[in-house]
């Protein structure tokens, strides 16, 4: 894991015809977030990637963050939640609207998710329209079981959530392209 060409990463996909990247970077979910590192009791190096965007048409700006929490370390996940909130304050002193997405490897009832939910809105609960699709997001590639555990999230601040959904992307050949269902939220800037 060198932080440049190999190792853990959490990509942010965007439409370059609609959005301009103003600044971007990555930090590690560890005691030394500025360099490739494994934090606390984590099994692997874990990261959060961020990008500040400007919407070309309107000029409005926002921060997008995407992460992958450890699947083993309880201490790492609690501390990662706290670090994320610290980094939001540090990176975003102008308090731009933001999205935080990723595989948190945790269910709603866990302390790390509760920590984040104190500062950011979970789109599952803050949507104008009811959630659509399966509640669970972790498939484990098992097409015979309906996923019950939601471990992937979209959190927002400064956005209104119009709708949110979990997309059942099982193929005709009964194979999943991932062990997680994609999740999607339709959001708009608060007025």
Give, region by region, the residue ranges found by the protein language model:
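Structured beta-strand-rich core segments of catalytic domains in phosphoester-bond hydrolases
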Residues: 1-61, 166-167
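Short histidine/acidic/glycine/proline-rich micro-motifs that form metal-
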Residues: 2-4, 70-72, 105-106
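Conserved hydrophobic/aromatic beta-strand scaffold that supports enzyme active sites
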Residues: 10-12, 48-52, 66, 153-154, ...
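Metal-dependent phosphoester-hydrolase catalytic domains
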Residues: 18, 75, 79, 89-98, ...
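Metal-dependent phosphoester/phosphodiester hydrolase catalytic core
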Residues: 43-45, 54-78, 82
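Hydrophobic/aromatic residues located in beta-strands of well-ordered beta-sheets
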Residues: 64, 98-100
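Active-site metal-binding loops of divalent metal-dependent hydrolases
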Residues: 67-69, 102-104, 181
